[in-house]
Amino acid sequence: MAGNSIGQHFRVTTFGESHGIALGCIVDGCPPGLEISEADLQTDLDRRRPGTSRYTTQRREPDEVKILSGVFEGKTTGTSIGLLIENTDQRSKDYSDIKDKFRPGHADYTYHQKYGIRDYRGGGRSSARETAMRVAAGAIAKKYLKQEFGVEIRAYLSQMGDVAIDKVDWNEIENNPFFCPDVDKVEAFDQLIRDLKKEGDSIGAKIQVVATNVPVGLGEPVFDRLDADIAHALMSINAVKGVEIGDGFDVVSQKGSQHRDTLSPQGFGSNHAGGILGGISTGQDIVANIALKPTSSITVPGDTINVDGESTQLITKGRHDPCVGIRAVPIAEAMLAIVVMDHLLRHRGQNHGVSTQTPKI
C-alpha cells in the first residue's frame, strides 16, 4: 500500500508533487480547542522555505499555507484539518533533459521501475518539496505540545562536511542562515558553501534534534517503541541515510559502566540513552541525530543510463541546494513533533490515570 501517511492517533497524510499545482495534507486526530492560525504554521514554513538565502536553492516559493478545514473561529474542531500550499515557481523546462534519463543518486530509476511511470519534473513526489506539508503539520503538533505540556522541540545543524560545531548556544540558531548554534563556525560554513558553488558540487550534513520536557511513559513496546517510531519518521526525510538516538553508534566503543544512565533521587546521572529506555520515554531530553547525504543534483558530469538502458552522461540543471541539510532543520523538528504528539495521545488514551508510588525523577 502507498506510504503517504504517518501516525496512528495523530495522523498526517500528505499529497502533491514538486511541479504540480499544489501540495497538501490532512491532519487527523488533533484535539479540539487548540487555537491555531495560518500565521502559526507560516513561521516554521518560512524557516524551511526555498529562496530565502544565497546558501540554498533559488527556487522562490512563498509557501503560503491555507487552512481549508478543521478550524472554526480560530480553534481546532477535532475534525480533519486540511492544509494546502500552491506551487508558484515551477521551471519544468529545466528538467526536459532528464525526461528519458536517470539522475544518478536520485529516485528516478527506482520510481520508474516500481511504477512504470514517473513525474520527472523536479523529482515529482520524491522531491523534498513534499516536506513543506510535514513542516505545516508539525507546526500544529509543536504548538499543542508546547502549550499543553511544555514540550519544546528544537534542532540545529551540527556539522557540514568536515566542519563541525564545538559548542551549542540555542540563542544563536535563528541568527544565521545555517541554523548553527556555534557563532564561531558560521564563517567556515559560509566559505564551504561558496567553494562548493564554484566547484558545482554538494556536501552532506548532520543535524541534532532535541525534545525537552517530554513526559515519562511515552512509547508502545514492542513494535511501536518510541525510538523505533522516531527513527522511522526521521529516516523518511529526503536524503537522510542514518539516524542515531542518544549516543548512537558511539555506544560501540563504550563499556556498560560508561553507557548506563545511573539513577538517584535527584535524577539521572547522564543521558547516553537519549531519553528513551525500553522504547519508553524517561522524562529526560529526547536526543536524535540524522546524517544527510550530499545531493546528486550537481553540475559535475556523471555517468548514467537512459530508459532504453543505454549509457549516457548527465549534467543536472535547475535550482538546487549545495547542502540539503540546511533546510532540513525545521523538517527534523516537524517529524519529531509529529511522533511525540502521536505517542502522547496514544499514551493518554490507554494509560490515563496510571500512577505509581515511585516519584518521577
UniProtKB/Swiss-Prot annotation:
Record bears the keyword Lyase: yes
Binding residue positions for FMN: R125, S126, S127, N238, A239, G278, K293, P294, T295, S296, S297, R319
UniProt catalytic activity: 5-O-(1-carboxyvinyl)-3-phosphoshikimate = chorismate + phosphate
EC numbers, comma separated: 4.2.3.5
Broadest EC class assigned to this enzyme: lyase
A Gene Ontology cellular-component term: cytosol
Amino-acid positions noted as binding NADP(+) in the UniProt annotation, renumbered to this chain: R48, R54
Cofactor annotation comment: Reduced FMN (FMNH(2)).
Pfam families: Chorismate_synt
Cofactor dependence: FMNH2
Family the UniProt entry places it in: Belongs to the chorismate synthase family.
Function statement: This reaction introduces a second double bond into the aromatic ring system.
Name of this chain's protein: Chorismate synthase
Species: Vibrio vulnificus (strain YJ016)
Encoding gene, per UniProt annotation: aroC
